[in-house]
């Protein structure tokens, strides 16, 4: 009997993320390997996300995670010692049962997820396999198209833009390494465009490494992207994507969206999206409406047939909410954030449900990130075809891109998803 996969030790600690806020790191030791994981944290979060447990004490302005760390060390770890690290679903289910809440609010999704990811990495290490191959097997070979957030707004920046992310997608590249190069060159060109129009101080960056120029107009922002792409020479290779995070500028009291100070109805906002997609090469829109507006999402999906409509706050990587969306035709793609649901197994379940119903999958980071590059491996393991992990700047973002370059080199003959983002096969 092979005991090398048996879990010998689990240890959690408090570390800091890219915003200087505390988060949970977990190390798992097996008889034959080792894995560690750091969980991310979001700024604009969906109401239905699993609970990120915070101490709410004076330390770190109430954002400490010592309670979550103690939950790992005192409650979860003693229960999992001796488990076979390959039994990922059994381990994840066991932790969910230990928590006994619908939203992981007792132990904390940040505690549970850190253990879940570290267990997978320890098992992969014990098997002498890269994580993407351990999770996905020999059929994991598709490299995702990056959605690079090069202009930040909303909750991620200090400017007046309502929309949270303006992204570039190099669908015309031939490989992930070429895609990253195209985006990096465009990013540097964009900086020159911004500095020439607004001055050097306008080149400051937001949480995800994108620039945060002093603009408030959506079209003006898209014009900046258009100019940068043209100047970089990639007009035929690079398209645009938006993350509107509409729940953040939705006024529930009067059922209006506040855009540049003007109240817009759902229908008026949908008309704005149609105009933008006619005027610019926008191929993907994330969270265009409020997180509870399944009907509005369904209407927009019908109106913009050639555009990917991504549910983030709408679905929160939750299979029950995704099932509702599928039944109603709300959106046609899932944004997969592992910390929204809290375990690796449940994240994979959500991705598989999306794939089975013709939905695309975008594996995503959070605005509060770390050097952990697990999501790069997950994107390849699932053959997702798309990854969203910020600008080609800041170490917590480039860690994921550099891991994708390594994976591409290791696979040898990968397929780059390119224009087939929702169905990369």
UniProtKB/Swiss-Prot annotation:
Its EC number is 4.2.1.11. One of its GO terms (molecular function) is phosphopyruvate hydratase activity. Mg(2+) binds at residues 243, 286, 312. This is Enolase. SMART domains: Enolase_C, Enolase_N. Belongs to the enolase family. It is an enzyme of class 4 (lyase). Its cofactor is Mg(2+). One of its GO terms (biological process) is glycolytic process. Gene3D superfamilies: Enolase-like C-terminal domain, Enolase-like, N-terminal domain. The active site is at residues 208, 337. The keyword Lipid metabolism does not apply. (2R)-2-phosphoglycerate binds at residues 164, 337, 366-367, 388. Its main location: cytoplasm. Keywords: Cytoplasm, Glycolysis, Lyase, Magnesium, Metal-binding, Secreted. It is found in: Cytoplasm; Secreted; Cell surface.
